[in-house]
Amino acid sequence: MYSSSNSFLGGVNNARPGQPPFMQQPPYSQLPQGQQQIPQQTGFQPQPTGYGSQSASHLQPQPTGFPTGQLQPQFTGFPGAAPPQQQQQFGGYQAPAQQPQLTGYPPQSQPPSLQVPSTTGLPTRLAPRTSSEIANSFSDGAGVAPPPPPKSSGSKIPNIRLSFITAQDQAKFEQLFKSAVGDSQTMDGEKAKELLLRSRLPGSELSKIWVLSDTTKSGQLFFPEFALAMYLCNLRITGRELPSTLPDKIKNEVSGMVDIISFGVPDTEPQGAARTNVPSFDAPLLENKSAPPAPQHPKPQQPSNAQFLSQLAAQPTGFGPQATGLQPNQPSLLGANATLAPQTTGFPGQSQQQYLHSQPTGLMTNPQATGYNGPRPPLPPMPTGFGSNLSSMQTGGLAAQPTGIPGQWGFVNAPSSGLPNIEALKQQLMPQPGREGGFTTAGLSGNASIPWAITKEEKKIYDDLFRAWDGLHKGFIGGDTAIEIMGQSGLDRKDLERIWTLADPNNRGRLNMDEFAVAMHLIYRKLNGYPVPNRLPPELIPPSTRNLNDSIGAVKSLLSQDAESRKASGAFLQPQKTGVSYLKEHSFRGGARSPGFGRKDATLFKNNDEAAAGYRSSARRRVGNDARPSSPPTSQASEEELSVEQLKKKIRETQIMLDAVDFKDENRAEEDEVLDRRDRLEAESLMDRTRRVQDDIDTHPNAVFRKLDNGAERRSLRRQLQAFEDQVPQIASEVRRIEREIADAKLELFRLKDAKAHPNSAANIVGTGPGGTVTEADRIKARARARMQARAAELAGRPVPASVDDDGAAVRRLEAESASIRADREKNEAMTRDVEESVREFTRSLEDSLKEEGETSTREHERRRWEDALGVEDVIRDFIYDLQRGSRTAHIRKEEESRASAQEQRLRHEEPSPGVSRLSPAPSAGSAGSLPGSTHEDRVAAARERAQRRIAERMAAAGLKPHTDTSETLLQRQEREKREREERLRRAEEEDAKREQERQRRLAEEQRSTSDTPAKPVGKKPPPAPPSRRGRTDSAGQAEVKKAAEETITAEQAAREQAIREEQQAQEEETNRLEMEAQKREEELLKEKEAQEARLRALEEQVRQGKIRKQEEKRRKEEAERLAKEKEAALAAQRAEIERAKERERQLQLELERLDEESSSDDEGPVNITPEDSTPTQSQLLPTVTPAAPVSAPESEQAGSPEDTSSQAPPVDFKLETESKNPYFKITHQATDTQVVSSPPVPQPSFTSPKADVHSTNPFHRLAKQETSKPAFTGSAPLERKSRARPEADDDWSAAGSEFDSSDDDDDERPGGGSAKQLASILFGTMAPPRPLSAMDDKSPSKSSTPVQDSPVASLPVPESNGSLSAPAAPPPPPPPPPAAVPSYDPSVAPPPPPAPPMAPPAPPPGPPPPPGPPPPPAPPAASGPPTPAGAPDRSALLASIQKGKGLRKVQTNDRSTSSIAGRVLD
């Protein structure tokens, strides 16, 4: 219940207005009232006597004197003495009156009446009582009734908004607080605990919350503290941590509101007791140290404070000091002259029923009922009596007593000087927007004790207010402003008039700083309940006014005294001739007896008229408007005449002084020059370092990413963002409109479906009402129509139609569907709103990111100064412009170099391709990837450009308009970019030239303006050494020099100011012009961008239309090609049959000859066996053979052949080729390969030197190179048509061809072993390759190797070619992997996919690849009969066949069918 054992001690003095401190009751003696002792305090805290350490219904007895037993010792008198026996007190509580208390020794009998008390200890000196004590003694009689208690008023909570909680929460907390405390202003600890426990938080958390909330440490909560506790509970409930200490903002708000509530409590002191300005607690200042402290006179308890005391911790009322006296006949431990007499305590003349009863002193055996009957907290012992050297005083454990005003209660957080209200007053009176509204004094008024004098803190606050309102620093505040300021205090006009009169004693109509402070202090006092004085107190008179008034008064008194003395002495009539001077007696420093006597002041001044002869005016020596030089002071020595020697001596001394001054000036000028030189060197070195750093920045690789014009880019992005944001509402409205249309369409669709499902339903009724609604008339008509239909059906014998559904079913179905549609629409609408909200949030985030971060006025000024060269000197401006020009030049140069290097690299990769294709017909050399040193990216880029060029050519041949971008060649693009760079350079040079012209113009204007002035401006040059003044003593010359120098300086300043103004104007104009130009450029760029986007859209549309037309033409061409291929296939089949018959006949003849010649067959046997065995094996194991290519690669590297790179690159290129889905692209590659191979057959042997021979030994390696070279070449239709005309050459086969065929037959014979069946199969199997279809891909030596491995596996390339939509040139594309998978895929070759119809027709006539019966369609393209046996297995046979050239001729001859097919596809 009690916060501590001493808490109620401190609370008594404040919680009980009008009650004196505990244990301080005035004594009563037989002496008259005038001889009573003055109330004195010893400086120690008041401490009660006689309470035990335990709390019970009755207090335990506590003796005073020596400690015996369990009670604490309390000894009387001097600290060194102690009574022989103990006294015992019994205390109990009985409210509101106190029972009598008996003190003393047992033998004494105490009369019921009051006895005369005597002070213990040494005899005290009596002192007269104060007037307040005398006045209070009359009102302490028993007949005086206590004043009526003040009316109870409910708890008043200031209308102040707490920032850390919401307005709704604050209103709820106010209601809860009022319901809990009733009329009180605070909530006790138990009630607060009960409320806080409802939060179900652990006790440790609630303990922390209580410690943070109880800011006053009083064990009770004011409303702001209660609201803070609720706020902290909410923080902990929501999972957030409690702060270790309250934030300053929250702490200030809570303490300020607590102070307002505390000061707003009405004063409970009796109305009749008038208070003085001097607080009663200043008594220690008047204390007489030699006299013992006199207890203060008690004041009656005011029962009206019970309502407040009920809300606070129970605190006992104070007793008067119990002076325990010794009997006179008992030996005193204090000495013979220190006998103590018994004394009574209590009020004299009061009845037993009112307040304290008389307490006779008596024996120890008599019980002494004291104080309370209720439980009391333990109190520490306190020695009574007086001693000058008290050292055993126990003061530990006492809490600090808060200050307050009698009549108030509770703990008040009031500062030692001033009150928090003054801060509120300052905030109220500070100039702020909207102050013209109504004024309120909420939180300003109070009843604080405010002295007349102004403290330093208050003066500082008033001075801050004055400076805040004195914006122009006039030093005073006018009447209008003062009315506005003082009107905000809310005082009456009469009070403000009186305050103004007191503050402005001189009636000037304005207030200076001191007078304003006086006015504010008077307002502050008035707000705290003090009346406005009629005259200004001396403490409030400003020091300046007081000193001035004192000085004026002193002068007046001096004048009056002087006049009286002159009148008395007769000097008043003729003061000049009296010869007596009274000036020394009239000094302000106190006259002749003052310590400063002898020093002259204004009272001792006397004008010397005789010295006027030595005065020489300098007015006639003034030149121009120069200021008048000070006249040489007249000295007393000028009256004396100097001798010639003295004059010469003075001249010499003056000359020496002038020489010294000249020397100093020269040294100073030299030092300045040295400093200037050093500064210039440092500036130049700094500029050089800056240039180097700028060059490093410009030449850094990442300098391209540096944003030079970040602001312009931000502005353009903000404009784009705004444009997009403006489109959002339009798009949202379109979406909503479409949603409505969809909903209407769904509803209409449902009506139609419902009408179909329920023909006779009422939903089929056509509404004629507004908006198509069905009316009752429409339903009646529908029912009548239905009855007519039913009757007609009965008459006609038809079945009666189903009964019409009731209207409710149709309506219900329609409503259900409408509800579902509406739900979908609402869902979509919610999604649309979510999208809009997300777009808005995204837009806000983008706007925040695009804002000028950190852009302040200072930063903008610095940027304009150091980037735009505004407001700097000419040298710095030129330096900044040079840096900017160098940066722009470096940026443009770097762009040109990067583009030039990129173009050179592109050209270097593009130029070798056509050269190689022209030099070598070999497919391996026709690709950019075959060049030594070329990378994969270069090869891909070159192939892409060639493909684009070929596509453009094909589109042009097909009559399609090519894309504008593709039509622009590399040279044209380079030319265009070069022109653009030149244009940018030209614009940059023009801007630089304009800036230079502007700068030159400003310099010329400055020179012109300075030339007009009489003196030449010094500029930046160091000042020259001052001229020597030796031999020049004329003061007129000095004046002229000085005047000329000042005129020069004035002219320089004027010229410089004019130049600065002109420069600023020019800079502003230049800045505006640049901004306008930048804006125009941005607008032009935006327009160009829009136009470019429009052109791109148009071109994309053209390309799309072109593609569509191209696809249509392609389909038509494919159809025509298919028909042509079918015809050609039939013709080819017929020609093949004829040729097969011829070959069969020729082979039979050769076989007969071989049978006769065994030796020749034996020699040829091994050759035949090897190809026959190896060919199928290789065809099946083609993937495993492919790794053998690197084996030949090192050989080629050692030989230095350029095909080394191509041997490694083919797989990658082949992958690109196989992934391509463009049939034209593949056909072009195949046609190009055939063209390249067939065009130069004759130079082949010469080109394939030993290197080529060595390289061609590996057929798979050649195959890979062939496939690699294919993607890079494109064939043309004319060559294919030419190849289609070659079939007739097959009929005219030469002897060389027969020899080649015979060699093939020999090769095929060996596997047969001489059997007729095997021979026939070999003969028929070898007939397929000679077909014209097979010779297409075998024109080049590299091709000859490919057919070799393809002859047995003729079907392998065909499926691959069909699958990839390539023409007869399909065999090359499949590298190692395809062959292995082809045999399984071979059966499907007969029905090839639609993209490869050309290959399908040739397939049926021949048959399967390896078997002789049905030569597969792919066999012709993939494998040529003659080269097959000679090339794949046996390298020597392959080389022999290549060197002969006859096989090549035969292959070229058989290219007709294949080329014709390809030509048709391409056309």
Curated annotation (Swiss-Prot):
Record family assignment: Belongs to the PAN1 family.
Polar residues: bias regions: 50-75, 129-139, 305-314, 340-370, 1171-1182
Protein name: Actin cytoskeleton-regulatory complex protein pan1
Acidic residues composition bias: residue spans: 1154-1165
Pfam families (UniProt xref): DUF1720 (PF08226), EH (PF12763), WH2 (PF02205)
BP GO annotations: endocytosis; endosomal transport
One cellular component term from this protein's GO annotations in UniProt: endosome membrane
Subunit comment: Component of the PAN1 actin cytoskeleton-regulatory complex.
Main location: membrane
Bias (Low complexity) ranges: 25-48, 77-101, 919-934, 1183-1197
Bilayer topology term: Peripheral membrane protein
Compositional bias ranges of the Basic and acidic residues kind: 892-912, 935-953, 973-1009, 1054-1087, 1101-1129, 1136-1153, 1279-1288
Entry annotated with the keyword 4Fe-4S: no
Places the protein is found: Cell membrane; Endosome membrane; Cytoplasm, Cytoskeleton, Actin patch
Function statement: Component of the PAN1 actin cytoskeleton-regulatory complex required for the internalization of endosomes during actin-coupled endocytosis. The complex links the site of endocytosis to the cell membrane-associated actin cytoskeleton. Mediates uptake of external molecules and vacuolar degradation of plasma membrane proteins. Plays a role in the proper organization of the cell membrane-associated actin cytoskeleton and promotes its destabilization.
GO MF annotation, one: calcium ion binding
Domain WH2: 1434-1451
